[in-house]
Amino acid sequence: MARMSLMIMMIMVAVTMINIAKSDPIAPCYFIFGDSLVDNGNNNQLQSLARANYFPYGIDFAAGPTGRFSNGLTTVDVIAQLLGFEDYITPYASARGQDILRGVNYASAAAGIRDETGRQLGGRIAFAGQVANHVNTVSQVVNILGDQNEASNYLSKCIYSIGLGSNDYLNNYFMPTFYSTGNQFSPESYADDLVARYTEQLRVLYTNGARKFALIGVGAIGCSPNELAQNSRDGRTCDERINSANRIFNSKLISIVDAFNQNTPDAKFTYINAYGIFQDIITNPARYGFRVTNAGCCGVGRNNGQITCLPGQAPCLNRNEYVFWDAFHPGEAANIVIGRRSFKREAASDAHPYDIQQLASL
């Protein structure tokens, strides 16, 4: 029954996407800032351990391995199709010409809000670097449209999705071997530092024409197979120390949304509760057709989480029954649920104050 319910849900999402794609998108463009949860190829040419351009990544994606840290779609792929785009948003590394008018994906695996986050993994493009790349894109949009006012009007209708912070915990604060932030900051003061840096970049985006912002909260990192493998005695109980810190950060994101909405009346900000949506999935897995919530479909060691999915490794066959694809990242089936609920909330707590569909219509 659970497998049947998941199949029905995926068919319904696919039909909805096809119907939407027949008309113009409800937003002219979609700009994406983030990390490996939404990277779709920007790290492929970097000297980095944080790359996913090899099999079995992309095993269920039509184009095969592209750099997505998933067996198939990411959440922003789902959202892009629900917005009405006929194709996925192009990564900055390969975006050229008129294609940028549809939007650009700047996300980079291992990236964080802090510049040093993820440095032990090699090359990555931190939030400030992603925003700098967008400023370059804006100048190209002005050239294409031929007028600054025309470009500003066009960009004001676009959706700007920002989902960073996970690596600032996973590959910084809770990694004392490489970073001192865990000793320098309390969870509260660290979240304050992240939010101050985050806010600075939002202001740069605003200055460069962004007016519709969707801030994606950090998920329950303490429930990932990697953290369960390292820190959970029974391999099932999430690491509350990490999840508690994530919730502190998320609560401050909500405060950012409220402050910007009050102080910048010509812009609209919303918070997407990825943490809450994900918690619902792992608390009620059968509702979504999942059977395994604590292990990766592809990985090595305890919970398939001690080493992430290796090149050429054979993944599980029942991928739609696993919440996680690898040691850190949800699989396509979970991404469809998260993307769908981000676009159109199913519970009041999924988004504050708007879901992405509502944001696009404002």
Curated annotation (Swiss-Prot):
Its main location: secreted. One of its GO terms (molecular function) is hydrolase activity, acting on ester bonds. It is found in: Secreted. Its EC number is 3.1.1.-. InterPro entries: GDSL, GDSL_esterase/lipase, SGNH_hydro_sf, SGNH_plant_lipase-like. The keyword rRNA-binding does not apply. GO terms for cellular component: extracellular region. Pfam families: Lipase_GDSL. Residues 1-23 form the signal peptide. Keywords: Hydrolase, Lipid degradation, Lipid metabolism, Secreted, Signal. The active site is at S36, D326, H329. One of its GO terms (biological process) is lipid catabolic process. The keyword Signal applies. Belongs to the 'GDSL' lipolytic enzyme family. This is GDSL esterase/lipase At5g45670.
